[in-house]
Amino acid sequence: MDQFASVFGKAGSLIRLDCRSLEYQYFPFHPEGYRLVLMDSVVKHELASSAYNKRRQSCEAAVAAIQKKHPHVEFLRDCTMAMLEEAKADISAEDYMRAEYVIEEIQRVLDVCEALEKDDYE
C-alpha cells in the first residue's frame, strides 16, 4: 500500500484502495485548522513469525461459519455485523472478536470516506 500511495498519491487527496480489485478512489483532504501527525514506531514486523497467521486463520474460520447461511461471502469485507452475529454460536470467542474488529474497521474506513466527501472533520 505504501508503494501504491507513493505512485498514485496526489496533493489534497487521500486514496482508498481496494486490494482485491486494485480499484482506487480519491477523497478530498483539506483539514484547515487541524494538524495531521504521522509517526514511525520503528517496530519491525515479520509476518511469518508473528501472530498474523493466527489472526488470518481466525478470520477464515469466521468466514467459514458465516458461509453456512450466506454462501456468497468470500471474505469478511463481504459481511455485515448482523451476519457475524448470526454465526456467533459457531465461532470461538477469539475468532469472533477478531472478525468483529475487521468488520468494524472496514465500516470505519467507509464512514471516514463519506465524511471526507462532506468536508466533515468532526
Which residues does each predicted region cover?
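C-terminal nucleotide
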Residues: F8-E122
